[in-house]
Amino acid sequence: MAVSRLDRLFILLDTGTTPVTRKAAAQQLGEVVKLHPHELNNLLSKVLIYLRSANWDTRIAAGQAVEAIVKNVPEWNPVPRTRQEPTSESSMEDSPTTERLNFDRFDICRLLQHGASLLGSAGAEFEVQDEKSGEVDPKERIARQRKLLQKKLGLNMGEAIGMSTEELFNDEDLDYTPTSASFVNKQPTLQAAELIDSEFRAGMSNRQKNKAKRMAKLFAKQRSRDAVETNEKSNDSTDGEPEEKRRKIANVVINQSANDSKVLIDNIPDSSSLIEETNEWPLESFCEELCNDLFNPSWEVRHGAGTGLREILKAHGKSGGKMGDSTLEEMIQQHQEWLEDLVIRLLCVFALDRFGDFVSDEVVAPVRETCAQTLGVVLKHMNETGVHKTVDVLLKLLTQEQWEVRHGGLLGIKYALAVRQDVINTLLPKVLTRIIEGLQDLDDDVRAVAAASLVPVVESLVYLQTQKVPFIINTLWDALLELDDLTASTNSIMTLLSSLLTYPQVQQCSIQQSLTVLVPRVWPFLHHTISSVRRAALETLFTLLSTQDQNSSSWLIPILPDMLRHIFQFCVLESSQEILDLIHKVWMELLSKASVQYVVAAACPWMGAWLCLMMQPSHLPIDLNMLLEVKARAKEKTGGKVRQGQSQNKEVLQEYIAGADTIMEDPATRDFVVMRARMMAAKLLGALCCCICDPGVNVVTQEIKPAESLGQLLLFHLNSKSALQRISVALVICEWAALQKECKAVTLAVQPRLLDILSEHLYYDEIAVPFTRMQNECKQLISSLADVHIEVGNRVNNNVLTIDQASDLVTTVFNEATSSFDLNPQVLQQLDSKRQQVQMTVTETNQEWQVLQLRVHTFAACAVVSLQQLPEKLNPIIKPLMETIKKEENTLVQNYAAQCIAKLLQQCTTRTPCPNSKIIKNLCSSLCVDPYLTPCVTCPVPTQSGQENSKGSTSEKDGMHHTVTKHRGIITLYRHQKAAFAITSRRGPTPKAVKAQIADLPAGSSGNILVELDEAQKPYLVQRRGAEFALTTIVKHFGGEMAVKLPHLWDAMVGPLRNTIDINNFDGKSLLDKGDSPAQELVNSLQVFETAAASMDSELHPLLVQHLPHLYMCLQYPSTAVRHMAARCVGVMSKIATMETMNIFLEKVLPWLGAIDDSVKQEGAIEALACVMEQLDVGIVPYIVLLVVPVLGRMSDQTDSVRFMATQCFATLIRLMPLEAGIPDPPNMSAELIQLKAKERHFLEQLLDGKKLENYKIPVPINAELRKYQQDGVNWLAFLNKYKLHGILCDDMGLGKTLQSICILAGDHCHRAQEYARSKLAECMPLPSLVVCPPTLTGHWVDEVGKFCSREYLNPLHYTGPPTERIRLQHQVKRHNLIVASYDVVRNDIDFFRNIKFNYCILDEGHVIKNGKTKLSKAVKQLTANYRIILSGTPIQNNVLELWSLFDFLMPGFLGTERQFAARYGKPILASRDARSSSREQEAGVLAMDALHRQVLPFLLRRMKEDVLQDLPPKIIQDYYCTLSPLQVQLYEDFAKSRAKCDVDETVSSATLSEETEKPKLKATGHVFQALQYLRKLCNHPALVLTPQHPEFKTTAEKLAVQNSSLHDIQHAPKLSALKQLLLDCGLGNGSTSESGTESVVAQHRILIFCQLKSMLDIVEHDLLKPHLPSVTYLRLDGSIPPGQRHSIVSRFNNDPSIDVLLLTTHVGGLGLNLTGADTVVFVEHDWNPMRDLQAMDRAHRIGQKRVVNVYRLITRGTLEEKIMGLQKFKMNIANTVISQENSSLQSMGTDQLLDLFTLDKDGKAEKADTSTSGKASMKSILENLSDLWDQEQYDSEYSLENFMHSLK
């Protein structure tokens, strides 16, 4: 059954997989109110259910829905009554002053004394609900309680993981003694709502009494309905919902009243309880409901109520409580009283709520926090007196003993201060004392809120309460002493302290000596486990330092050594880039504020230790003696709460460089973060070296100057044999030299040594272990050879082998030695095995050494270049730098070398001889080394790797549709398809997302970029990436002087372009004759151009623009590779010089698309457009209008490559089209283009907005009056015709798709005939059209054409019959202009049909070709037609891939190849639905869905019956449950024990295990299908399975014979009994008589009976109708009836009302037929595919039906059938979400409209989930049984004060 669009939006609120999806659904609900204001209360009543949901996401989404809805409700501002006007009766009744709560009667202390606490819940969910509990045996009751309690606590999974839960609680714990009512009444607490009503209200007004009466009337019916709603809504979150509850709501009634066209589906709450009174604010009743919910025992309901009220008041805070027919003064008073009433309710929540979430490091009280935000919104609109009264009550809460009450009070004050800054002068003095007490509270969560409450009013605090600030500052400093890793208030206190210290006044009032004592209190937080605390600590230090000048920093001197040590070791241990940058900022500020002498004195003793820390090996823990330990004072707790683990002693954790949390990362990632930490440490020490080398501290009279000491220290480490020591010192020298131009003492000490290092080849200490292992293994190998009398000792060094000698040993020496001896094969095998082991060790050792050697030489070279004292010979410097560019896998090292090369080139510009040209040439060669990026002219795309070839020819053909040759093809298209092939071919789970701390890697790279690459590609990628880093760095370094100072680079970019291309006389043939060499040179030049241009200084952009004509000429170069590179360069140019590039492109290049005689031009132009679109992304939007139509024209191009590329471009443009509206014309656009743009925009408006379509006047008479929506459909089809487009008309079944198609067919044939008669042009020549449909409908189509249109205009040929008949008909085709044939006939005669060019090809029920791999689909796609139209009421039946096949017929390539489609849409969508998916993957899935919907939107037209047919009677669907007969039960149970069932279990299990890697075997799947078929047949009738071959047949037959029964008695088939009763109830078969007493000729009801199987129809006919209901007349329509005769049966049934019943199979009778003669539909069986059942029932429920249609579905209870119905509902959600009513009005598609397609990836998972609890449970299933709250990030987002304040603006 169809779910309405509105219901789907609500379903998304609850089940949307991402917050983005839920928010989009919420926004669309707001749009509904905008268009249908009268639906306000209906919508709000539905939203209320979701505000009460147990699911956090659902409540937040419901709050967003409330926000979206109320934003579209006009502000309530009734016209005030003047004092002279008489008041209405209703307002006379009211007494506003008495009906509201007010402060005068409110006593918060009394409430605290007598009110019951509001906890997480009332505990009702843990009670056993059993009306007969008194009669049950106590043991049974306890057993049931135990089971229920285990389930609720998530302990029912214990046994599955081998954990016993029996002893957690015993029977005595569960037994209870009923408590007498009198005892309960003596309890001193009352429910909050009761207490408020009884104690604080003065009485009820007349209006309230009247309202109470109305509510009482509604209460009875609402109570039962609420129960049902609650059960229904909790199904998702409650696993153990009893089956009986679900069945209560199984009967679904679709009701449609005469004056309302909306369809009501499922249980919709009665909105009458929320109907507003005429003089009331429209939202009054809804707010009252929410106010009542504030005191619900369940925290989730309270939270939802607070959320709803907050959103309403943001938009309508000025309207609450106002009554119409009141004076202005009365309205103001009513408003303030209403606000006061609400404030008091919120204060009661603060007082009584005790629920808090302790999941994270800080308590989050969702109810109190949300109510505090709501209070903030209320106070915004309250008068000043009310604000002060509110604050007075909040202050009373701060005096209470319970920490939760104080916490709530401070939350209220926090938002009050933030919102009412206008009265801060009076508010702040009132509350400040209490807040300061809060800062000293024993409870750390209270302290956290107290600190947070002052952050937004820091400025006011400093200026208004200056005298209190010193005390607050001291309090905060003292609080730092009490904080530790587990305290909650750390972040808030650090933030407040940092905020206060930014004000000079605060600095002045701080005593200098005190900072010396206070600042060290920050040290522990530099090493805090939570990054936000570390950040806050650094920001506090930076604030302290930046607000001081050097003269007033005396407090810094005593603590300077410790501060330097803490910050440096913090740097070494940190892994976050953001925090590392902040460390550098604080360090530099510290060095600038402290005197140089003091810095040198403090730092020099520790310089050596710091260098050692920086040199720490990455795999070894740091010696804790080298770290300055931080001792935080232990916090003594005397009250409040203690978190788990707070009292435990902390373990001493091992520390590693770059953080212990990264130690388990993969080697590439770990190497990246460690190198980043070393480089940052080098920056800090480099800055420190500047201080040490300062002339002021290096006085001549000193014995030992600091600079000289530094030089000696650095030299000591450079003389070490450790690679890490050398690398670290070289890095420090680089950073120091970058900051300070010259320091002779250090330079003289280290420069010679650095030059020596560049020529040294050492075996470093770091490879000692593998080197020693290599020596030992080599000696063992030599010894093993000696054992078999092979002496090799004389050929190798007997002492220590070098790596080269070891390598020779295991290759040349070993092979020569063994080959000269005749060894036993077994001995030789053993020796070779040892050799391979040694060879592996040698290779590993060599690789480690090579990496270290290269890095040592590279950083030494960088140091020499940084010192700016280059030696005479530059080769030792240049060589390692270039090698790093070519070979280094760590991007940080490559980047460092790239920066050094840029500096080297700068220093060498004036040098003779100058090495720059050689360096540039080498870099350009390296840049072009990757054939995947820089194509080779002779072979433009690299040959397929063996891996792809191994996939087999079929998959390769499927994935790589486009072939590229030397002269033809589009490389961009090839790469898109190859990428899609790679993505869809990848097996296994999606790779994990890169963690946050390594996410900030250089663009285009990551720490683990080489993990998934083919080993053969890896060197190319590394070398190309290094060259790219180097060239972009060089270009940025030289800026605007690049062309002058580096003429060789400029020439490499544009030289071949100028020399090869003559823009005035371009001759492709002569270029071809010159051979491949100039073309390859041009390709390489363009690669350099692309790389360098993107980073070039804007001063050089005009020079680049001068070469645009050359680039455009290259787009028609005969070489594919040149065209490709030129297209990429045009793309880059469009990004850096958009206006100039696009103007020339539109004027010169875009017209080439129409050059159908020159495919080279077309390929170049379309590839360039693709590259421009890729580079500009949304920047292309201003030009879209001018691009769409030319691209559209190429979507049917004869050249495959052009067609595929054009469809891809068009698909992208279509998605961006909605953004085009309102974008101004780009500057400097020519007048011609602006004029053309206006013309093309008209087309776009029609494409995107169906309402702007031109009305199409059908030029031929049609014998029917078209309804408006049918005329709209014809207009749409005519629009497609005009622009040579194709589409899917997917109107709901029964809306006249056939008629609309006939109209456009007849109209276009007439138009073509007239045009041809006038012009005689070949393109207007009359052509026949083809309609392909299911065989049942061919006759129907011919009749419909004859009925609606004269043969003069459409002359159909019914092409059917056996082959000989069809051959005869083929000769008649020329005499007809319309051929109607079935799909099978077209498939069989495709050789005939493919040779005819058709005008229209219409596929009726076109979803038949949903599987593109069937012979039928392949045949249909061979048809040639000007226009292709698909008619289908259900274009998507199971999954989204079906849509690809339909569009592959309409517009091949529009959605890419099947693999591209799967890569772009299928893979992300599937990944986003995986339980393990990251938030990034979920977002990608949502965006993919949005992109797909947007892309296909203009080519789908969808209207639903309930939207367009006001006169169609309702359709009522009812499920009719039957219970299995004893015989069926026996057979069902026998099957459950059978071998067949075991086979199925094994198959499903193996399929589950293999689903990540491969699909289950076909044969195994067949077992499952057979088993399912068996059970389905058994549910229908035992005779269908109990055949003579059945093992139980004989026994059963004998048993029945004894009982005088047979297998065909209807008592054994409850469905037949139920069907008989239904027929009798409909007045059939019981000899029904008319009112006159005579037997009625025509029955009151006529019935369609649908079965799946022909054999079941036989049973219905022979076992039920003939023996039991002989008077029932019936016809039959199934597969046994020849297609040619089926139409006559349909006509006879429709035209002869005396035929009571039509028996049909769903497959034959469920498509396209018009059976409006029936008004009742019975499904004896159900289809796996819900669309088929839907189509079947709509045979009767369609245009022409005058009576209510009743649909009965016979379902056997508790069997497979119930699961089939559940599966149907799931698939319906898929189809309705993709192809929705939005397609009826294209303008309704906003950028935030998303689709939520899949919740499962294939059918079997639903059942699989149910069976997964047997045996050992997976961790996933255990976790799913436990409920939890949102994580901390989500809380931060929801309760961010900054976000909240922004939302009030």
Curated annotation (Swiss-Prot):
GO CC, one annotated term = intracellular membrane-bounded organelle
Report the sequence similarity comment from the record: Belongs to the SNF2/RAD54 helicase family.
Q: Report the EC number(s), separated by commas if there are several.
A: 3.6.4.-
Bias category Basic and acidic residues: which stretches?
A: 223-236
Cell compartments where the protein resides: Nucleus
Phosphoserine modification, residue list: 91, 95
Where does motif DEGH box map?
1404-1407
According to the record, the residues making up region (Disordered) are: 77-97, 219-247
Citing just one GO molecular function, the answer is: TBP-class protein binding
**Name of the molecule in the record:** TATA-binding protein-associated factor 172
* Subunit and interaction comment: Associates with TBP to form B-TFIID. Binds DRAP1.
* Residues of the Helicase ATP-binding domain: 1278-1453
Top EC class for this record: hydrolase
Task: Summarize where ATP binds, as residue positions.
Answer: 1291-1298
Could you tell me which residues the HEAT repeats occupy? 385-422, 426-463, 513-550, 554-596, 818-855, 872-910, 1102-1139, 1182-1219
Tell me, in a sentence or two, what this protein's role is.
Regulates transcription in association with TATA binding protein (TBP). Removes TBP from the TATA box in an ATP-dependent manner.
Q: Which UniProt keywords apply?
A: ATP-binding, DNA-binding, Helicase, Hydrolase, Nucleotide-binding, Nucleus, Phosphoprotein, Repeat
Q: Where is this motif: Nuclear localization signal?
A: 191-207
List the CDD domains.
DEXHc_Mot1, SF2_C_SNF
Biased composition of type Polar residues is found at 85-97
**Coiled coil spans:** none
Q: What InterPro entries does its record include?
A: ARM-like, ARM-type_fold, Helicase_ATP-bd, Helicase_C-like, Mot1, Mot1_ATP-bd, Mot1_central_dom, P-loop_NTPase
One example of a Gene Ontology biological process annotation: negative regulation of DNA-templated transcription
Residues in Helicase C-terminal domain copies: 1636-1790
Q: Which Pfam families match?
A: DUF3535 (PF12054), Helicase_C (PF00271), SNF2-rel_dom (PF00176)
